[in-house]
Amino acid sequence: MPKIPAINPLLQAWLLEGPLSAQVPAYVERLRRGRYATHTSSRWLNGVAHFAHWMSMCHIPVHMLDEGCIDQFLRYHLPRCDCLGGALRTPMELHAALVPVLEILRAEGVIARAPAPTGPIADELSRYDAHMSSARGLAAGTRRGRLRIIERLLLSKFA
């Protein structure tokens, strides 16, 4: 198992003994491959530990996780959170830390892939992505960022 950055012992127990313990090595490896700073890695692991503790308290099995669970955690648990151990409570940082967990779970086949969006806006975004890739030669990360912006524009104007 990759070396885990230093976090509070209580949080480390939540992380290594909780429902997401099987995904911790892949998560730590992802942080290492992404060359995240030690401070960021520690904070994100803190956030994953906090989420794992909440999952345990709510008896949510790993195979039931999806974006809705993360939203529920952020909207309903955080505002009244009294968890110990200096648990991370910053919604934006927690969201950033938890999205990769879903990606790892999907890659491992633990949870189903998110359904592909459908409809005219999704079709237009797909065509625009193909154009940015083939005609413009843009990298995947650049395309994702631009697609998020265009999606918000299209949704605000046409949805």
PLM features: what roles do these ranges have?
Residues 110-114:
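Charged interaction scaffolds used for protein-protein
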Residues 11, 16-19, 116-120, 124-126, ...:
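Intrinsic, low-complexity N-terminal interaction/targeting segments
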Residues 17-26, 43-47, 124-125:
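Helix-boundary capping/turn motifs
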Residues 2-7, 24, 34-109, 138-159:
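Non-catalytic DNA-binding core/recognition domains of DNA-processing enzymes
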Residues 28-32, 52, 129-133:
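Amphipathic alpha-helical segments within well-ordered protein domains
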